[in-house]
């Protein structure tokens, strides 16, 4: 009997992008851990015989160590997706033209680094908008995977804003939709289709939207995250509880017919010695060996129940199958744009 499929994707957020989101001024120096990350990723992927999608930031692909990173993953067999050019978690504030320019600039950087034209996109910080979905369709993307259908994003944002006292008023305004909207909890937890009719904007006729969405899977019904960073952080308090949590999440996925999409991050494979200054990030005080053990458990648990594929294959698998549809206008809820809000 064939196993149902599940997909795995890693958002290749670099050292500087974490510092930028946190508001650290020295992010402009663009510190990078890509050489170390490359080795850790391929070692882990090889161990578990998986070839995930890796969503790469365009500015990193264009940096000195970017081509080696992209080429190593491409040669290994990973799908390379787009994660925007500047990793702005306030991408929803961009105008339609700025979004097209950002996406095209990223495509050019990824292809110059040795990857094919990206087929899929994940927004940094789950910063979605109706204009973003239209831009993805205009540029012929096959799928998006930016939805995290949870209520916990606004809670995490409030904690982040309360504990980060150094942010300016402008920086706080930029981050007011960080980690998504409360309304996102009402979006499907299974793949669905974004839809919208054609329309005219600034004298341009924009095509109708029909775009596959593969959400980052959350715990069915409870709608809390299950991606690796959360489970690894939980294991810092109790390994048995973390293992029970992931087992329960997979049991609920099976019961609800959810073919999950698991999100990984670089910091799942790194510790504080690899990225000094990121101690604020949950789990960065854990020894690398402990993190690797928990990640191994997560990947093994998924592999026992599912055939692990990349996001492109997951998106392709639902073509021709009736799925839910959502209008792109729902992405405006909780992400109201302030035209005066500056972008850094």
Language model features with spans:
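A structural motif corresponding to the C-terminal end of an alpha-helix
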Residues: 41-50, 76, 109-116, 201-210, ...
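The substrate-binding groove and active-site-proximal loops of carbohydrate-active enzymes
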Residues: 25-32, 55-59, 87-99, 118-119, ...
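Histidine/acidic-residue-rich catalytic or RNA/ligand-binding cores of hydrolases
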Residues: 91, 155-160, 226-227, 272-280, ...
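Metal-dependent polysaccharide deacetylase catalytic core of the NodB/CE4 family, i.e.
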Residues: 48-132, 141-157, 209, 218-220
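Conserved, mostly hydrophobic/aromatic
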Residues: 11, 45, 80-83, 106, ...
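Active-site-adjacent pocket scaffolds in enzyme catalytic domains
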Residues: 115-116, 123-257, 343
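C-terminal domain-boundary segment and adjacent tail
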Residues: 47-49, 233-344
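Active-site beta->alpha N-cap acidic-glycine motif
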Residues: 1-76
């Amino acid at each position: 009997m064939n196993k149902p499929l599940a997909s795995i994707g890693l958002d290749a957020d670099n050292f500087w992008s974490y510092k930028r989101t946190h508001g650290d001024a020295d992010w402009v120096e663009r510190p990078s851990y890509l050489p170390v990350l490359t080795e850790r990723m391929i070692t882990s992927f090889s161990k578990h015989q998986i070839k995930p999608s890796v969503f790469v930031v365009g500015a990193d692909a264009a940096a000195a160590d970017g081509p080696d990173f992209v080429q190593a993953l491409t040669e290994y067999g990973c799908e390379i997706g787009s994660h925007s050019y500047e990793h702005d978690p306030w991408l929803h504030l961009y105008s339609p033209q700025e979004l097209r320019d950002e996406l095209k600039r990223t495509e050019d950087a990824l292809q110059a680094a040795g990857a094919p034209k990206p087929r899929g996109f994940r927004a940094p910080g789950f910063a979605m908008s109706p204009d973003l979905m239209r831009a993805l369709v205009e540029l012929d993307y096959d799928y998006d995977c930016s939805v995290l259908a949870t209520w916990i994003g606004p809670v995490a944002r409030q904690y982040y804003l309360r504990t980060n006292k150094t942010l300016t008023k402008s920086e706080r305004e930029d981050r007011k939709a960080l980690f998504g909207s409360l309304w996102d909890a009402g979006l499907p937890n299974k793949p669905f289709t974004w839809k919208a009719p054609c329309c005219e904007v600034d004298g341009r006729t924009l095509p109708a939207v029909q775009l596959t969405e593969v959400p980052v899977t959350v715990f069915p019904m409870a709608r809390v995250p299950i991606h690796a960073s959360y489970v690894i952080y939980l294991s810092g308090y109790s390994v048995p509880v973390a293992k029970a949590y992931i087992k329960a999440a997979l049991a609920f996925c099976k019961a609800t017919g959810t073919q999950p999409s698991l999100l990984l991050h670089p910091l799942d494979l790194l510790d504080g010695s690899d990225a000094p200054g990121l101690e604020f990030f949950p789990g960065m005080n854990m020894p690398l060996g402990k993190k690797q053990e928990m990640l191994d458990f997560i990947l093994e648990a998924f592999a026992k129940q599912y055939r692990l594929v990349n996001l492109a294959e997951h998106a392709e698998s639902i073509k021709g199958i009736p799925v839910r549809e959502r209008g792109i206008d729902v992405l405006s809820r909780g992400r109201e744009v302030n035209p005066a809000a500056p972008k850094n």
